[in-house]
Each structure stands twice: as C-alpha cells, then as structure tokens.
Amino acid sequence: NLIYRNGKKEDGLNDAGLWFLRSVNYDLWQEHPEVMLIAEDSSDYPKVTAPVVYGGLGFDYKWDLGWMHDTLDYLATPFGERSAMTNRFLFSMSYFYQNNHLLPLSHDEVVHGKKTIIDKLWGNYEQKFAQLRCLYLYLFFHPGKKLSFMGNELAEFLEWSEQREPGWNLLSYPAHQKFHQFLQKLHKLYLEFPCLWEQDYDSRYFRWLHMGPSIFVIQRSDYQQNSLIAAINLSDKDAQCTLELDCGLVSILDTLDPEEKNVCDVTVKSKYPYSDKITLSLTVPALSGVVLKPSELQKKNIKKKIS
C-alpha cells in the first residue's frame, strides 16, 4: 500500500509513497490531461481526488468500495432481515462528497468463488432478475460515475474467466434478453437526462425523498432544475409511501416485465390549502422500481380536480 506503511493505518503514513503518487499524477495531468486517473482505494485517507496543488493525491476518481460492498450485502440478505440493514444501505451518501467517487461492479466481484452479480442476490430465479434490474436502476440514480464489468449486462451466472468469452448465447434466453433490453433503455435514459450525470459531485442536486425500509426514493436534478425521481421497492411485498411535491409525476420507465399485471401507481391524496404542495401516494410492486418525471400538465389537472 502506497498510502500507509506496510498497508496498515496504525503504522503511519508512507511519506515516500504519497510523494510518488502526487509526483506521478501531477506529471501525467500536465502531459496527458485527457487521461483519467482512477484509484482503487479502500482506505479513508482524505483528498484522494483533490488536485495535487491543493494537497490532494491528484486522482480523478476513486472506487467507492464501501457502496459496492454495502449494496451487494444488502441484496444478498433475506427479505425479512433487510429492514435491519437500512442504515448500511444508505451509508454511502454520508461520505460520498468527500471524494469524486466511482461506483464499481467490477471484475473483482465476479471471480475466485465470489459468484457473479446476479448470483449474489437473494431469492429464486425470477426474484434475482427482478432485483438485478432494481440494482442497475439504483446504480444509475446514485451520484457518481459508473463502472460495470463485461458480462454483467448479460446477467451471467458463470464467473468471469480469461479462458473464455462472455456468454453471448444467454441472450437467447427470455430472462437474460429482457434484462439486456432493460439496460439498453436505462443507458438511453441516462444519456437523455443530464440530471443523472451533470452534477454528480454537488450535494445540492441530490435528495432522498424516502429512505426505506421498503421503498427508497431518489431525486436527481440539474442546473436548470430539471429532475427525475426513482422509486425502488427492495422488499418482496408491494409497498407504499407518501411524497410531498409541487408537481404531479408520470412514469417513463420501470423495471417490471411488460407481461406482469402489477403496475407502479401514483395517486393524489390531498393538496395543501394556500400552497402549491401536493401529497402523492406512490405504490410500487414487490422487487421493482420506477422512474418518474415531473409533469406540469398533470399538476394543472390535479389542481383543477382538487379545487
């Protein structure tokens, strides 16, 4: 470990190692500013992604290994025990803005008997796929750049090996094909809405609207105050939550199989007198998520209907 002597925090800082990192990163930044410098670092050493001139190590991004472990451990936990892990699931945002974090679902997690991403998840075959779609929706709505290792988009059940190519034949199976198609829609959504990436590292543009224990609701915004909301139900039962907003909401993407009869439902409960605030009741089916877009048209209709 270049940060601590003998790789142990209690042994003190490795001054020579820190000098080396700062020198190399500064020179690379000067000569090749187009190159991304990314640290795979599990320590809590500060300012890993701060510029060298400000006392940092000069990396552009740092792997958020805490987010990865907490999220995957949560999804590997039986449904009935997840409420006790809510704080751990939410913990990543308590330190996220200390560095420019990158969210990794990397090669490290799909080798050496660790199982693939989908195989780590609790539940039966159908529940694993449902949660995998929820996981990627959460990944794309959580602040931070994204890293997903090849084969993850196929929902591989076989661990990665350098001796064979990814299992492209999996796309001939309906569940894998539907997951792959969902990811395509999610990528398209990500590119279409700057609020999902424009202000990753500014806390003013992220907000928890509901923090579990069943439904987690995230709002992402951009400079122009355009926003999207993701509501994700990680329990095995349909769940409901209440949101207080100044507009209506319309669904533009969900993780549900088109053949399923369940739907995500948004209904108006009340409107505050002398206020633009609207109380919305949001019902999300078990192990599913929905992307919601503010709707000015719906807002006008709601006001007319309630007044």
Residue locations for each model-derived region?
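Active-site-proximal helices and loops of the catalytic beta/alpha 8
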Residues: N1-L102, Y138, A155-K188, E198-D200, ...
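Short loop/turn segments at secondary-structure transitions that flank enzyme active sites
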Residues: S43, E109-V111, T255, Q298
